[in-house]
């Protein structure tokens, strides 16, 4: 287990690395949080790229660093975009974060979340 000081030191070092490399951080997120997510990425030195379309998601998976996928407010296009992006991330060996908002609500959301198991997100974000 890490001490608070060790955690603080690791966070500071990670932010310094991000600022020096300015990685592209792709996001497929919901309309409620899109500005917050982009601004958070920019604040720590990332280069935010928010996308909706399947080909854009695949491009980000190959060109960018890590990707954030949030299923909070689904749009019909996400039925194609999310699985294609997750597959491309998996095939490229890129890290990605899944925020599985509202698990079990609706057939589309449930179907998408089941598909993600095959592509093994690096981190699954959850609210406590």
Where are these regions (language model features)?
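Glycine-rich phosphate/dinucleotide-binding loop and adjoining beta-alpha-beta core of small-molecule
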Residues: 57-128
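Glycine-rich phosphate/adenosyl-contacting loop at the front of the ribokinase-like
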Residues: 1-50
